[in-house]
Amino acid sequence: MIKVYSTPTCPYCVTLKNFLKEKGFEFEDIDVSNNQQAAEEMVQKSGQMGVPVLDIDGEIIAGFDKERIKQALGL
């Protein structure tokens, strides 16, 4: 399962979500700007407040680290 913790105004979040869509991956988009519980979950998982944070089956990737994301997805 893939979760993307993001905000509507984050350009890297948009880039990340477009990348996942282009590669054919479905994901849960979690807007942490209006969901305090999700924001706390994101900080607990990643140790940081910044977005995007990607959770790929429990592997946490902070930011749009394209090579690390591709590796985690088996691309």
Language-model features, listed with the residues they occupy:
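Local sequence-structure signature of Cys/Sec-based thiol-disulfide redox active-site neighborhoods
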Residues: 1-23
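Short hydrophobic/aromatic patches at helix-to-coil boundaries
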Residues: 1-3, 71-75
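ATP/adenylate-binding site constellation spanning eukaryotic-like Ser/Thr protein kinases
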Residues: 7, 35, 66
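Short alpha-helical
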Residues: 11, 37, 68
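Thiol-based oxidoreductase modules, predominantly thioredoxin-like and allied folds used
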Residues: 27-38
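Thiol/disulfide oxidoreductase modules built on the thioredoxin-like
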Residues: 41-50
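A short, hydrophobic beta-strand/beta-hairpin element that forms part of a small beta-sheet core
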Residues: 52-60
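Conserved N-terminal glycine/acidic-rich loop preference
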Residues: 60-66, 70-72
